[in-house]
């Protein structure tokens, strides 16, 4: 997993509430176990018509938002089934941060495990960021995880909370495998000691 570093990116406004995981990545794309290649199918049923053509009015199809790395979303983002393909699809599209007033718990946790930062803020602050995101390609925000700050295109600074352990993992690029490998020496020492103490096991 890549280390999460301070970055400046385009923020896309997506005010619709209750965007569920089926809207993020429909069920027909869940056959793969690869994390790459799903970005093209993110928000598939909103992004494309039945003929597979792009829907011009969908926010991520607009020229100003095609390179978005931040989503400012409506309440209860990521609700629905617990498919991990949802954060896979967003990450593969290029999304690094999702900001909302609330998230479904499983989706929220899966974001951290896949190198994405979900940020929960009060409604008034989300409204401010949503308005800023509506500026199109000028809607560039800076996210500083170390300082736990979002800086808008106008220079307004918004503080956010994040669990210290989750923050540590993102900053150091540690997923579950990476966390285990941090303890590789201790695991090896335990296995060697256990083999001597209980050779019959």
Swiss-Prot record:
Pathway this chain belongs to: Amino-acid biosynthesis; L-leucine biosynthesis; L-leucine from 3-methyl-2-oxobutanoate: step 2/4
Q: Which InterPro entries match?
A: 3-IsopropMal_deHydase_ssu, Aconitase/3IPM_dehydase_swvl, AconitaseA/IPMdHydase_ssu_swvl, IPMI_Swivel, LeuD
Q: Which domain of life is it from?
A: Bacteria
**What keywords does the record list, in alphabetical order?**
Amino-acid biosynthesis, Branched-chain amino acid biosynthesis, Leucine biosynthesis, Lyase
* One Pfam family per UniProt: Aconitase_C
Q: Which EC numbers does the record give?
A: 4.2.1.33
One of the GO BP terms on file: L-leucine biosynthetic process
Give the reaction(s) catalysed.
(2R,3S)-3-isopropylmalate = (2S)-2-isopropylmalate
Q: Does the keyword Acetylation apply?
A: no
Gene Ontology molecular function: any one? 3-isopropylmalate dehydratase activity
Listed GO cellular component terms? 3-isopropylmalate dehydratase complex
- Assembly behavior: Heterodimer of LeuC and LeuD.
| Described purpose of this protein according to its UniProt entry | Catalyzes the isomerization between 2-isopropylmalate and 3-isopropylmalate, via the formation of 2-isopropylmaleate.
Q: Which family does it belong to?
A: Belongs to the LeuD family. LeuD type 1 subfamily.
Q: What is this protein called?
A: 3-isopropylmalate dehydratase small subunit
Which gene specifies this protein's sequence? leuD
């Amino acid at each position: 997993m890549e280390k999460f570093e301070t970055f400046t990116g385009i923020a896309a406004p997506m005010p619709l509430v209750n965007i569920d995981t089926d809207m993020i990545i429909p069920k027909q794309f869940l056959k793969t176990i690869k994390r790459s290649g799903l970005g093209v199918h993110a928000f598939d049923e909103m992004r494309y018509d039945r003929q597979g053509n792009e829907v011009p009015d969908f926010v991520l199809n607009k020229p100003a938002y095609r390179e978005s790395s931040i989503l400012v979303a409506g309440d209860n983002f990521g609700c629905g089934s617990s498919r991990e393909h949802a954060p896979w699809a967003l990450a593969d599209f290029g999304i690094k941060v999702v900001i909302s007033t609330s998230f479904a718990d499983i989706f929220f946790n899966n974001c951290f495990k896949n190198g994405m930062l979900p940020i929960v803020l009060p409604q008034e602050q989300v409204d401010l960021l949503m308005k800023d995101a509506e500026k199109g390609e000028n809607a560039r925000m800076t996210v500083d995880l170390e300082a736990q700050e979002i800086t808008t295109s106008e220079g307004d600074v918004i503080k956010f909370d994040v669990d210290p352990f989750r923050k540590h993992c993102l900053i150091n690029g540690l997923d579950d495998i990476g966390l285990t490998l941090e303890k590789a020496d201790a695991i090896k020492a335990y296995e060697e000691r256990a083999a001597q103490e209980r050779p019959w096991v």
